[in-house]
A protein has these predicted regions:
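Long, low-complexity, compositionally biased intrinsically disordered regions
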Residues: 1-143
Length: 143
């Protein structure tokens, strides 16, 4: 999944779209971990794509975005998924796992913050509490 991990968010999702749209015209294995193929791009353009799954930064494509640069483009992603379709599900599982971890961390942070607020408010005197409430209500008038 190295190649997929190195792609920008946009290249990754567009590459998945290209894979689903069957834009891979053909491919062949050049050597172990090295593949060459043709991917149909926008309009009638067809791009020559070479991917090296062991060394993704050695991958190449002659599209305007990637030509002469060491970046991962949507055509490389499409070719990689065309050759190894199981990678898509693995990546989706990984993304889901990361989202769940993020949501759990966010929920924990919110609970901690809520507890801090409760503790702070409970320490305020009645007069301080009234003043904070008045300030907030006045603030809300303008925002």
């Amino acid at each position: 999944m190295k190649l997929l991990n190195l792609a920008s968010n946009n290249s990754f999702w567009r590459g998945i779209d290209y894979h689903h749209e069957n834009r891979i015209i053909g491919w062949k294995e050049l050597a172990e971990n090295c593949y060459q193929g043709k991917v149909r791009g926008s309009g009638n353009a067809v791009y020559d794509v070479t991917i090296d799954t062991a060394h993704p930064r050695k991958s190449a494509c002659n599209c305007p975005f990637a030509e002469g640069r060491r970046v991962i483009c949507k055509h490389m992603i499409a070719l990689d998924l065309g050759i190894f379709p199981e990678k898509e599900q693995q990546m989706m599982d990984y993304i889901e796992e990361q989202n769940q971890m993020y949501e759990q961390e966010y929920e924990k942070e919110m609970q901690e913050r809520e507890e801090e607020i409760r503790e702070y408010v409970m320490k305020l005197s009645k007069a301080e509490l009234r003043e904070k409430l008045i300030q907030r209500m006045i603030n809300d008038l303008y925002y």
